[in-house]
């Protein structure tokens, strides 16, 4: 389960499209948001209907911070990890943000280079 921040605004459809695209690539990977239409609450019935008892949590967030450490992987009763464990799943959390990997870091640096070049023009 990939945890995205989400939004209550019109951009929430982008998260839904992202989740649909990911599901076409791998039906065992889900995208849910902290805010929006597709949340952990809406995903839990689907997870329960699938065979398997292990869930991996992955943050779709730039950096690891409060949302990853508390909202996703924390021990509190509202954390996704805690809620999944209460639902009977064995849960593991990956504590690396998108910027920790080379792909997104390189993508952002290329965009930054373009923006700086445009300022010089």
Where are these regions (language model features)?
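Extended amphipathic ligand-handling, pore-lining, and cofactor/metal-binding catalytic surfaces
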Residues: 1-121
């Amino acid at each position: 389960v990939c945890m995205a921040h989400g939004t209550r605004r019109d951009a929430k459809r982008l998260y839904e499209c992202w989740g649909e695209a990911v599901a076409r690539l791998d039906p065992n990977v889900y995208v849910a948001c902290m805010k929006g239409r597709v949340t952990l609450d809406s995903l839990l019935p689907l997870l329960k209907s699938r065979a398997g008892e292990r869930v991996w949590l992955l943050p779709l967030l730039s950096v690891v911070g409060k949302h990853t450490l508390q909202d996703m992987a924390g021990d509190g009763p509202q954390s996704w990890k805690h809620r999944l464990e209460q639902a009977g799943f064995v849960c593991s959390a990956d504590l690396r943000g998108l910027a920790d990997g080379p792909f997104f870091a390189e993508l952002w640096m290329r965009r930054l280079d373009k923006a700086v070049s445009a300022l010089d023009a």
